[in-house]
Design a protein with these regions (language model features):
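N-terminal "leader" segments that precede or initiate the main folded domain
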Residues: 1-140, 247-284, 459-483
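Membrane-interfacial loop-to-transmembrane alpha-helix junctions, especially the N-terminal start
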Residues: 5-15, 56-70, 152-155, 217-224, ...
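Hydrophobic, membrane-inserted alpha-helices
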Residues: 17-24, 43-46, 203-207, 224-232, ...
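Membrane-embedded catalytic interface detector for glycan/lipid assembly enzymes
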Residues: 31-34, 90-100, 123-263, 267, ...
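Hydrophobic alpha-helical membrane-insertion segments
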Residues: 60-78, 154-167, 275, 359-369
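Central hydrophobic cores of alpha-helical transmembrane segments
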Residues: 61-72, 222-230, 267-274, 417-421, ...
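Small-residue-enriched transmembrane helix-hairpin modules in multi-pass membrane proteins
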Residues: 183-187, 279-420
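Hydrophobic alpha-helical segments
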Residues: 392-490
Length: 490
């Protein structure tokens, strides 16, 4: 019980200390309105506070972490780094946007605060009227659970073979990689592979971990399996976001710990060490595979990109003199790549153009090959995409809060963020209910939704399709349960 009480106190103290420290770094280095900055950091503190205390859900935890990293943290970190003798560019994608006026900073802080307040009010409403987890973790035994218990080793063996095969075929046939447009056919296979690699395979791993964790069986093995599947899938799609999948697992452990469910410290520690090693390898390998795309010289495209001679030679040098380079890459990603305040300032720099009609114009954006996104064209003054032999499609995204600011209305930003918070709460509620109380799967579902909205801002209609895919990801288990009931296999 003492651990249950102490734990939030430590988190709250750290939260308060960090926000106060960042506030003083900002007001001593930037010519901005100190009162606006105070409200900005106070609202950031309360967002984390409400997300990690009293009737918490995973959606709000993930959302508050991403928002905090993208806004208060990213605004202050260049000056924190400077005090230690390091230099960090607040705008790594567009260095010409370093000289903003005082008014732009103040407007960006005010609009950001409105969005954060919208999330806070949504959290308050959610706790009172919508959904929160009970302290009891009751496993709802269903046909899927009985099937897993009866055929566990066969299921896990088939699963391992399946995810290894899917990842290999995806890389070899170049079916789906982030930021790259291939001409793979048939198109329905791209959709299937995309769903499996982004959501499907991991959703099954969430079930395996949940069943073993709740029944207090060998959850270490299925946790390792969850990490390995996420690791290989992220490499296969050239994503460096594996660290967030790690976060899902450990935030789930933290959720159990808060509710006084005992988990072996030695198991958590060994999983953490293993996860850190995989994070290092994920960033290293993915960076090299991305370089294979950029440096690909086979005009006839006879040679497979990721299995070409040059690419394979590059991979063999994986750990040769690469440690410092990978650490620098991790440092860069940790400090500069969060989506938030930089895009808000880019939007506020064109404040005279912002209105609801302009916002609606952005909502109608359509994909045009070799063209930059609307955000890049109209706010970052970028035009044509760079062309390579392989058609890369790297997009700079403003994020949900900054995107809503295109309306030019603080109230609209507040209301949009409030509505998003309510939608996220209901999504987690339904995913928890329809997955038979599988809180690890509902954590994964909430992460998928938060990650998409934090990186919102290109082809908005595609986000609706992505949302439907998320809903299917947890509803599929209702379908499997129904099928098992009908065929009476148990």
């Amino acid at each position: 019980m003492m651990n249950k009480i102490k734990n939030p106190i430590y988190i709250n103290f750290l939260n308060l200390f960090l926000n106060i420290s960042l506030y003083f770094f900002v007001i001593t280095n930037l010519d901005i309105n100190k009162f606006y900055a105070l409200l900005f950091y106070l609202s950031s503190f309360f967002l984390i506070f409400y997300s990690f205390n009293f009737k918490t859900i995973f959606f709000e935890k993930f959302l508050s972490i991403f928002v905090w990293l993208g806004f208060p943290f990213k605004l202050a970190i260049p000056y924190v780094a400077l005090s230690f003798g390091y230099e960090i560019n607040l705008f790594p994608e567009n260095s010409s946007y370093n000289n903003f006026s005082k008014d732009v900073y103040n407007d960006a802080i005010n609009f950001s605060s409105c969005g954060i307040l919208g999330f806070i009010f949504a959290s308050i409403v959610r706790k009172k009227y919508i959904f929160f987890y009970s302290s009891e973790k009751n496993l709802i035994k269903n046909n899927i659970w009985f099937f897993y218990e009866k055929y566990k080793f066969k299921i896990l063996f088939i699963y391992i073979i399946t995810f290894i095969s899917i990842n290999f075929f995806n890389l070899y046939f170049e079916i789906y990689q982030k930021g790259i447009s291939f001409d793979f056919a048939p198109k329905f296979l791209i959709v299937i592979f995309k769903w499996l690699l982004l959501m499907g395979l991991s959703s099954f791993a969430c079930c395996f971990v949940y069943y073993d964790l709740v029944k207090k069986k060998n959850y270490k093995f299925t946790s390792v399996l969850f990490l390995l599947e996420s690791f290989f899938s992220n490499i296969s799609i050239l994503s460096r976001a594996f660290v967030f999948n790690v976060g899902i697992l450990f935030i789930s452990f933290f959720h159990l710990f808060k509710n006084n469910v005992r988990i072996k410290f030695s198991v958590v520690l060994s999983l953490l060490i293993f996860a850190i090693l995989l994070i290092f390898l994920n960033i290293n390998i993915t960076s090299k595979l991305r370089n294979c795309v950029v440096n690909y010289q086979n005009i006839d495209k006879i040679e497979k990109i990721f299995f070409s001679k040059n690419c394979l030679v590059s991979q063999k040098k994986l750990l040769s003199n690469e440690i410092s380079g990978t650490l620098n890459k991790i440092s860069s990603l940790s400090f500069a790549r969060w989506v938030g305040i930089d895009s808000m300032m880019a939007v506020m720099s064109k404040k005279e153009s912002l209105n609801l009609s302009y916002y609606i114009f952005f909502l109608k954006e359509k994909k045009i090959l070799y063209e930059k996104s609307y955000y890049e064209k109209y706010f970052l003054n970028q035009d044509k995409s760079k062309t390579h032999i392989i058609n890369t499609n790297h997009i700079i995204l403003p994020g949900f809060v900054s995107y809503q600011s295109i309306s030019g209305s603080k109230f609209f930003v507040f209301l949009s963020c409030f509505v998003l918070g309510i939608i996220g709460a209901y999504l987690e509620k339904f995913s928890y209910r329809y997955s038979y109380n599988n809180f690890i799967l509902s954590a994964f579902i909430s992460y998928l939704f938060v990650f998409r909205m934090i990186h919102f801002g290109y082809l908005p209609f595609n986000t609706f399709i992505y949302f439907l895919a998320i809903i299917f990801t947890f509803l599929q288990f209702k379908i499997y349960n129904f099928i098992l009931h009908k065929i009476k296999i148990l």
